[in-house]
Curated annotation (Swiss-Prot):
Compartment annotation: Cytoplasm
Lineage: Bacteria, Pseudomonadati, Pseudomonadota, Gammaproteobacteria, Alteromonadales
Enzyme Commission number(s) from the entry: 6.1.1.14
The keyword ATP-binding appears for this protein: yes
Organism: Shewanella amazonensis (strain ATCC BAA-1098 / SB2B)
GO molecular function: arginine-tRNA ligase activity; ATP binding; glycine-tRNA ligase activity
GO biological process: arginyl-tRNA aminoacylation; glycyl-tRNA aminoacylation
Record keyword Ligase present: yes
Name assigned to this protein: Glycine--tRNA ligase beta subunit
GO cellular component, one term: cytosol
Enzyme class: ligase
Catalytic reaction list: tRNA(Gly) + glycine + ATP = glycyl-tRNA(Gly) + AMP + diphosphate
Keywords: Aminoacyl-tRNA synthetase, ATP-binding, Cytoplasm, Ligase, Nucleotide-binding, Protein biosynthesis
Gene3D superfamilies assigned: Isoleucyl-tRNA Synthetase, Domain 1
């Protein structure tokens, strides 16, 4: 078998930058699947992507499929011939369909009888014949929500396609993909290098495109180059570039030949809160802000040009000119907003409807205020500060700055609160009310901030469930799943002594008569319990551990977490599997008992040595684990219970639980019930696999 390297390049108009990486990775996965289906072995497959191209490089690809013998089984010999030994119509039809006569068919003996069989030698197809159709199928399966047409044909793709190159080593694979006939043409940079050139070999793709076309097609290399050059540029001016991963990926998807440059803006703009300036630079202009070593924003930014200019100063000046009006707008909004206190904007919240059935933003702020004060009282934080922060929590939505730069909500509330002389805890809580904003984001840690962040999310959950708008399927327009995870994370990560039942009840109560769903509290609790499972699964916790804890329905998230950790640890113990199996056996036995289960153990009725030993061991360990349960030290309690394994095993080996003597039977059931109850203080261990 021969092997060669394959290059596939699809040359397009500018591709959507935020989708570029996903498109390339999907193309790679889809084509890899095609190769596997076609039984074409290969060594590796790499993807390349730039604004005007998607490419794959398959290393060590077989140049043809292997020849193989195809076995096609026909009817059973018994039904293939009649009583006179003549072929039946079924046998003749099968043979005709395979291009043979019944007499030419072979016979296959199996343990289920003898069958007619046709074995054919099928020659493998050359890879060059298969690649065009495989490429088309791989492209057809790309995640393209809105494909477009171009020209006069009916072909659809995410952007118009101009070139298709298929090279197997130095051989051009002839074929049509996306309505374009393949050739050797590779298009270079729009403004530098050769506008197009002919590629002689698949292995020369990256080098030729870089040297002749002035395009770095390797996405990862381009991204790494931008990051390294931006860090160097920031270091030159004594700072550190703020290189957010998502922005770096977007910038790498916008340029083919990255040139990193440093620009400057007037220092007067530094009087504006840094977050607003950073939002403008990152969100609108795709610039990297620069911070000093002590975390202060510097009057500089780093940007990436898509051209190597003879006069970079002109490009720098152009970018400085573009960003200046945006920074001036931020300065104007900030200075205008400062003329009014946050508290003075409370009345204007009455003009904005939060949700038709749930009232205005002012109604929402008042509910958050009351709920935050309630929560703060339970966690030892200032109820007064929490209530104040809750009341002001939505006031910055009415400021010019937040209306223009929406992502600064909360953050601008903090800055304006400080200018108004509000307590620092109040100001910080205004910023942290929306945390965590995304997976991996930090949670608030200060008591007042926790109270307000929890209140903000619980008000949303209780309200939306209360009007019957719970998430359905993948749809979640109110981001309730994120809110639920936020509630759980804040409580668990801060070890707050809060019970979900109490919090939800208070949140529902504060909505008053607005809620039409009488089951809102129960549904919110079930929803949060369901998010527990999703959250722990994302953290790599085994599903059976989660289900074991969920079976006990602990409604204090911090307590729930302690149980998860304890059961996860217990699962690693040598005795765990045997005790889980024993618990399952006990559970099945007790489930079959009709009527009320006996609860007290009569030592006088313990007749077998094994049941006496188990009862004694249980009596010995119970006073040890009782205070551990009370203190929530579940891990140590389960470790102590693990010592029962030997006694439990011996009990089931020697003792007949369902004895004919009812008194003996009830006493043994009481012993097993007592044993199971000890484990149930933590979780249903019988659910462990």
């Amino acid at each position: 078998m021969k092997f060669e390297n394959l290059l596939i390049e699809i040359g397009t108009e500018e591709l959507p930058p935020k989708a570029l990486r996903t498109l390339a990775e999907s193309f790679q996965a889809n084509f890899s699947e095609e190769l596997t289906k076609a039984e074409l072995p290969f060594e590796s497959i790499e993807w390349y992507a730039a604004p005007r191209r998607l490419a794959l490089y398959v290393k060590g690809l077989a140049t043809a499929q292997e020849d193989k013998v195809v076995e096609k089984r026909g009817p059973a010999v018994q039904s293939a011939f009649d009583a006179d030994g003549n072929p039946t119509k079924a046998a003749e039809g099968w043979a005709r369909g395979n291009g043979i006569t019944v007499a030419e068919a072979e016979r296959l003996a199996t343990d289920k009888g003898e069958w007619l069989v046709y074995r054919a030698n099928v020659a493998g197809e050359p890879t060059s014949v298969l690649v065009p159709a495989m490429t088309q199928r791989a492209l057809d399966k790309l995640p393209i929500p809105k494909p477009m047409r171009w020209g006069s044909n009916s072909t659809q793709f995410i952007r118009p396609v101009h070139t298709v190159t298929l090279l197997l080593g130095s051989e051009l694979i002839a074929g049509e993909v996306l309505g374009i006939q393949s050739d050797r043409t590779i298009r270079g940079h729009r403004f530098m290098g050769e506008s197009s050139f002919s590629l002689d070999h698949a292995d020369n793709y990256l080098a030729a495109l870089k040297e002749r076309g002035k395009v770095i097609a390797d996405y990862q290399a381009r991204k790494a180059l931008i990051k390294a050059d931006a860090e160097k540029a920031a270091a030159v001016i004594g700072g550190n570039a703020d290189i957010e991963e998502s922005l770096l990926e977007e910038v790498a998807s916008l340029v083919e030949w990255p040139v990193v440059l440093t620009a400057h803006f007037e220092e007067k703009f530094l009087a504006v809160p840094a977050e607003a300036l950073v939002y403008t630079m990152k969100g609108d202009q795709k610039y990297f802000p620069v911070f000093s070593n002590d975390g202060k924003l510097l009057p500089n930014f780093i940007f990436v040009a898509n051209i190597e200019s003879k006069d970079p100063a002109q490009i720098i000046a152009g970018n400085e000119k573009v960003v200046r009006p945006r920074l001036a707008d931020a300065e104007f909004f900030f200075n205008t907003d400062k003329k009014h206190t946050l508290a003075s904007r409370l009345a204007s919240l009455e003009t904005v409807v939060f949700q038709k059935q749930l009232g205005t933003l002012k109604d929402r702020a008042e509910r958050i205020s009351a709920l935050a004060g309630f929560i703060a009282g339970q966690i030892g934080a200032s109820s007064e500060d929490a209530a104040r922060a809750g009341l002001l929590s939505k006031c910055d939505l009415m400021t010019n700055m937040v209306m223009e730069f929406t992502d600064t909500q909360g953050t601008m509330g903090m800055h304006y609160a400080r200018l108004d002389g509000e307590a620092e805890a109040v100001a910080v809580a205004l910023e942290e009310q929306y945390k965590p904003k995304f997976s991996g984001d930090s949670v608030p840690s200060a008591g007042v901030s926790c109270a307000v962040a929890l209140a903000e999310k619980l008000d949303t959950l209780s309200g939306i469930f209360g009007i019957g708008q719970a998430p359905k399927g993948a749809a979640d327009p109110f981001a309730l799943r994120r809110a639920a995870i936020g509630v759980l994370r804040i409580i668990v990560e801060n070890k707050l002594p809060l019970d979900l039942v109490d919090l939800i009840a208070k949140a529902v109560e504060l909505h008053g008569s607005n809620l039409s769903n009488a089951l809102a509290a129960d549904e919110v609790l079930e929803f949060l319990m369901g998010r527990f499972r999703a959250w722990y699964q994302d953290k790599g916790i085994s599903t059976d551990v989660i289900l074991a804890v969920l079976a006990r329905r602990p409604t204090r998230p911090a307590d729930f977490d302690d149980r998860i950790l304890a059961v996860s640890h217990f699962r690693t113990l040598e005795q765990a599997a045997a005790l889980a199996a024993a618990n399952k056996r006990v559970s099945n036995i007790l489930a079959k008992v009709e009527g009320e289960l006996p609860s007290s153990i009569n030592d006088a009725l313990l007749s077998e040595a094994a049941e006496k030993a188990l009862a004694a061991k249980l009596a010995e360990v119970t006073p040890v684990i009782a205070p551990l349960f009370a203190a929530g030290n579940y891990q140590q309690a389960l470790t102590e219970l693990a010592a029962l394994r030997e006694s439990v095993d011996q009990f089931f080996e020697d003792v007949m639980v369902m004895a004919d003597d009812q008194a003996l039977r009830n006493n043994r059931l009481a012993l097993l019930g007592n044993l199971r109850d000890q484990f149930l203080h933590v979780a249903d261990i019988s659910l462990l696999q």
